[in-house]
Amino acid sequence: EVYIYFPGGFGTLDEFFEIATLVQTKKIRKVPIILYGKDFWEPLLNFIQKTVYKEHAAIDEKDMKLYTVVDSVDEAYDYVIANVTC
């Protein structure tokens, strides 16, 4: 099982945050979460790191490691092969 999110709107963001929250709170087992497209995701992730983590301490540093950002199909494929077992 793996979750791969591509750039999208509120629905995509909702789904990403829902899965990240479920993994963070251990409501579901840890699964690989891939965010595809650095140009799209990095501004949001920078906000999370700067504001949510550093300024407000609302999450732990380990929570920012729940997901991986990739910028190519090859990177996504390599990550899946390395982190998903059947």
Give the positions of each predicted feature.
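A charged, well-structured terminal subsegment
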Residues: 58-86
